[in-house]
Amino acid sequence: MLYAVTAIVQYLLEGNLENMLGRRHMKAEIAKLKGHTILCGYGKVGKEVARVFANEQTPFVVIESDEKAYNKATDDGFLCLNTNASNDEALKEAGIMNAKSLVAALGSDADNLYVTLSAKSLKPDIFVVARVDNEESEAKLKRAGADRTMSP
């Protein structure tokens, strides 16, 4: 009994309950979105895209697997999921079935290709913009279903 009480107090002191409740609230807010954009990646390019979306009041949710970048996105006030964007479940949790578009702004062309394939397999009519660093990858991203590409 004492161990259980100690564990609960420690959990509360470490802020885990606040994090858990915050994440639950964030997931509930994401579930309400309709016609939004999913932004995959909150690196240099993703931050700039998020800034533009925020300025234009475009509803969006960020998917970021890096804990530090995830924390930065939430600190910046954005709805964000801390998971891998190439995972179909992550895209579903971000509301892909209700989303109008997706921006694949991950650091590698291969990751952006995989996210594009995943997004188009889940929702073929979603509009996808994919970051591309290598000219050779641009054609592959278009074949995978990217409607537009962007080069940083």
Model-derived features: where do they sit?
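Cytosolic regulatory regions of ion transport systems
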Residues: M1-P152
